Amino acid sequence: VPSFDGSPLDVDVTRPMPGTGNSHPLIVLLHGFGNDKHEWESITDAADGADKYHWNSHWFAAHGYYVLTYTARGFRDTGPRASYQPATPAGVAPTCLPPGGSACPPTGTIRVKNKDVEIRDTQWVAGLTALAYPDINRDQVAVSGGSYGGGESWLQAAAQAGSEYWSDWPGLPRLRMQVAVPRYPWTDLAYALMPNGHPGGASRTPAGQPYQGTDLYSSAQGAPGTLGVGNPIGVAKSSYIGGLYSLGTANGVFDEGTPSPQSNGPEPFTAWLGRVDAGEPYSTPDRVDDPTMAQVRTAFSGWHSAYYQPGWRVGRDAGRTPAIFSISGWTDDLFPPLESFRMFTYLKSLDRDWPIAVVVGDIGHARAQNPPGVWQAINQRAWLFLQANITGSRPGRTTVSSYPTRCTGSATAADAISADSPADLAKGTLTVDFHDSVLLPPSSGAADPDAAASDAVAGGTITSTSAGCRTSARLTTAPVDGYTAVSQPLPTEQTLVGIGHAQARYAATPGTPTAVLAARLWDVAPDGVAVLVSRGVYRFDFTGYDARSGVVQVPFYGNHWTFPAGHRLRLDLAQVDQPTYRPPNPAVTATLDLSATRLVLPLRSAADTTIR
């Protein structure tokens, strides 16, 4: 069907099963990047038994929902990829690329969930669906999707918060969206693809001074309510960005052309990627981005990310608070839990009764294991949340919940813990004081075999089929072209739950505008086998964001992980962690003189513990 601008979209509608009533909710299920409309379609309730279990077209139709699935603008439809998916045909149109779908230049190109393009596509097609099926309840609409669809689900919630009607087109029914269920989503795409490690959220600086955030659970490209302005451009996730670009060019067509200051204008993704690949420096003195990176900051923050949308404050003031159930993965190295945590924190700061819940587990993109039992438990919780709010979002106390990551055996519903905020999942702190000093030149870490072995794309999942948990590639814990420190054995079992950080005093050599500090956290068993627990990165920008000396905190992606008694904690620090992150350009990168190195980790237990 033609979208709001005439671009063809490949659309399927699954009708509710007989005997499910006379008035029906509508749910839109949005596919991931490089996928198509078939992703959430199923001929059974069980589907894949995990992510799609009781969360697919068959399940919702059996419970009285209309289900709208369509192939996003710019992507081909190559047909069903799993035996449980129905053989719905691909849509075809004269301007679309074979074999069908929604890759239909010049307008039907990938826009990476632009708020004025794909977001409007969904609203338009939902309106067409409600027009075609009058028994759809126009006040009972939900949106859900994973990854690419998760990022859009958040943007759709922002759109509803900012307007009385979610879908409001001349000649089409007006619709209200009550619930969004983003799954392994982004909320700040600029930060998710290029994390800078700087705190976000509320500013700790006086009015008129440069922005400085205060909260590692809200780390972001910039301050909410801006176009991502406040923190420096971060470190590119090279393996993921390269893989996603290849996937997009294989399964679709990216938008290109001369960039526009308007969000609905052309977006030159290939040129932007080329500038990111060229690396630092990204900004000039006084915190001014170079012209191309300024485009990247504005587009990927303000146009493609829910965190920066003005609709949240508008909705707060108008009493419109769509219900949101956001699902993220501790071991998801593409869109870590921070993507849900920052929005939980922000929305609760606007309205403590905003109906937003977050659930985190060993799920999502690689390195995640995605255990079926955890997914089934999470989907049951998501279903109950959806049913409770589809007739109208219900403000009140909501929580953040976490399922532990395990190497052998799956966590169960009984293993989940909950708290009133992401930080409150932990009750105590484990501090590991190494008291070491080390010089890290720009090339430090380049020869470390664990860089490739631990990468989410090159290294695979956290486990392998032959040998339990993925382990360190090193034969010893000795440093390899970087810094490695190992703690004393833990006297008692300790459970990490939260983000945590590596910390050090630093001094950077003068005359260069940037530096990088990448960190990895390992669990070392008594036999010397080390298992990756988490990683993180911080980019120094000495053009006005960072001082030449001070104390740096490198936030980890986080985990819910138990260190048994007798195990030791290992910290790796380096400037190069390739291919996970783009290595810094040596000519413009400072050498870092580190001292007083330590780990600071949030613990589930209430006691504070310090070891060496």
Q: Over which residues does each language-model region extend?
A:
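N-terminal cap/lid segment of alpha/beta-hydrolase-fold proteins
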Residues: V1-N22
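Short substrate-entry loop that stabilizes the transition state in hydrolases
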Residues: T20-H24, L29-H63, L68-T78, D333-P336, ...
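Accessory cap/linker subdomain of secreted extracellular hydrolases
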Residues: E39, A46, A50-H54, A62, ...
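Alpha/beta-hydrolase fold nucleophile elbow
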Residues: P134-Y148
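Glycine-rich nucleophile elbow surrounding the catalytic serine of serine-hydrolase chemistry
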Residues: G145-L155, L334
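Short alpha-helix in the alpha/beta-hydrolase fold that links the catalytic acid
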Residues: P322, P336-Y346
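Short beta-strand/loop motif that positions the catalytic acidic residue
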Residues: S326-S328
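C-terminal, loop-rich substrate-recognition/catalytic regions characterized by aromatic stacking residues
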Residues: G373-R612
